[in-house]
C-alpha cells in the first residue's frame, strides 16, 4: 500500500511511528522537490499559511482574546503594530505582504542573503528586511507586538529561535 499526502512527519512522531508500523510506503508531498530544489506541492499551502498567520495573529491582539488591544494598522494618533517575521521564504513573504497591506510596521528576518536582496526589492517601504542572528532577533522581539514563525528546513522540524524567557522581556 502506498499513501500520497501531506504528512509533516517532522512535527508528528506518533504519525511517523504509525506509518512505519503499518508497512505502507509513504510519499510526503511537502518534501517533493523539483530540479531547482523548489517544493512545488508545498508552495500553495505555504502561501495560504503566510496570509492566514497575519489574520490569526490580529485576532489574538484583540482584547476579547486577552490580547493587548492593538490594531495592526493603528488609527490616527495611535501607532500601527510591529510585526516580526522569522523566515523570508514563501510563508514569510506572504505574511509580510499582508501585514504591510494592513499598514503595520514589519521586520522580516532571514539568513539567506540572496533571499534578503530579493525581498528588499519587492517589499513595500514599511517592511524592513534584516539578516537574522541572535542579537537582531532579541532586538526585534522587544519591539514586536506579533511574531510569526516562518522558517523552513525541508523535511525537518523548524528550529526554535526564541526562548520562552525572551517573550517575557
Which residues are covered by each model-predicted region?
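Active-site glycine- and acidic-residue-rich loops that bind
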Residues: 127-129, 152-161
Amino acid at each position: 500500500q502506498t499513501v500520497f499526502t501531506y504528512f509533516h512527519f517532522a512535527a508528528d512522531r506518533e504519525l511517523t511511528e504509525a506509518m512505519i508500523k503499518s508497512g505502507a510506503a509513504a510519499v510526503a508531498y511537502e518534501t517533493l522537490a523539483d530540479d531547482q530544489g523548489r517544493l512545488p506541492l508545498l508552495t500553495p499551502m505555504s502561501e495560504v499559511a503566510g496570509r492566514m498567520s497575519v489574520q490569526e495573529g490580529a485576532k489574538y491582539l484583540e482584547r476579547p482574546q486577552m490580547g493587548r488591544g492593538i490594531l495592526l494598522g493603528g488609527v490616527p494618533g495611535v501607532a500601527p503594530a510591529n510585526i516580526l517575521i522569522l523566515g523570508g521564504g514563501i510563508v514569510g513573504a506572504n505574511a509580510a505582504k499582508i501585514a504591510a497591506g494592513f499598514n503595520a510596521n514589519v521586520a522580516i528576518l532571514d539568513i539567506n542573503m540572496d533571499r534578503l536582496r530579493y525581498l528588499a526589492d519587492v517589499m513595500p517601504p514599511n517592511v524592513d528586511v534584516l539578516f537574522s542572528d541572535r542579537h537582531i532577533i532579541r532586538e526585534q522581539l522587544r519591539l514586536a507586538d506579533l511574531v510569526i514563525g516562518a522558517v523552513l528546513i525541508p523535511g525537518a522540524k523548524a528550529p526554535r529561535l526564541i526562548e520562552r524567557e525572551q517573550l517575557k522581556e
